A protein has these predicted regions:
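Short amphipathic, positively biased membrane-proximal segments
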Residues: 1-150
């Protein structure tokens, strides 16, 4: 059986959007279970904007989340041209992203560093797993409309 290794830009965008939405579920669920503020992570992300420093902003956090998710989605798209993805490889890539985002960059921003780290790592793994799943090789006979899944 031949597997398609190509994906459409639309498929990449849809996968990235789904991953961006789903990726906040672990930390949100953890916050709700522990009685913490479920929007704290989004507000903390807002401090990554220039001149926001330690002034958390929900709107700023949404903007940062969309931008960072778009950047990592682009990186996944470029990597998927060379390597096959799936949920497991995507989750592993999510761990690599978490290492960069949380261990190297996030610790420089106190509001990010103060977040429950396990939940943040789970968010990154969820992002990678969902996007990896969206970019998985699909059997060519399963692709609609002339081999395109746009």
């Amino acid at each position: 059986m031949t597997r398609a290794t190509e994906f459409s830009t639309g498929g990449l965008v849809r996968g990235g959007a789904l991953a961006a939405i789903v990726s906040g579920l672990p930390s949100t669920a953890w916050a709700l279970l522990t009685g913490a503020d479920p929007l704290a992570a989004a507000r903390a992300a807002g401090t990554l904007l220039p001149r926001r420093g330690e002034r958390p902003s929900l709107v700023g956090g949404v903007i940062v989340h969309i931008g960072v998710s778009a950047a990592w989605t682009t990186a996944f798209g470029l990597a998927a041209r060379r390597w096959r993805f799936g949920a497991v490889r995507g989750a592993l890539a999510g761990l690599a992203i978490a290492t960069l985002d949380l261990c190297f960059l996030g610790r420089r921003f106190p509001p990010i560093a103060a977040l429950p780290q396990g939940a943040q790592w789970a968010d990154h793994v969820a992002f990678g797993a969902v996007l990896g799943w969206a970019l998985r090789p699909v059997p060519s006979h399963a692709l609609p409309c002339s081999g395109s899944w746009v």
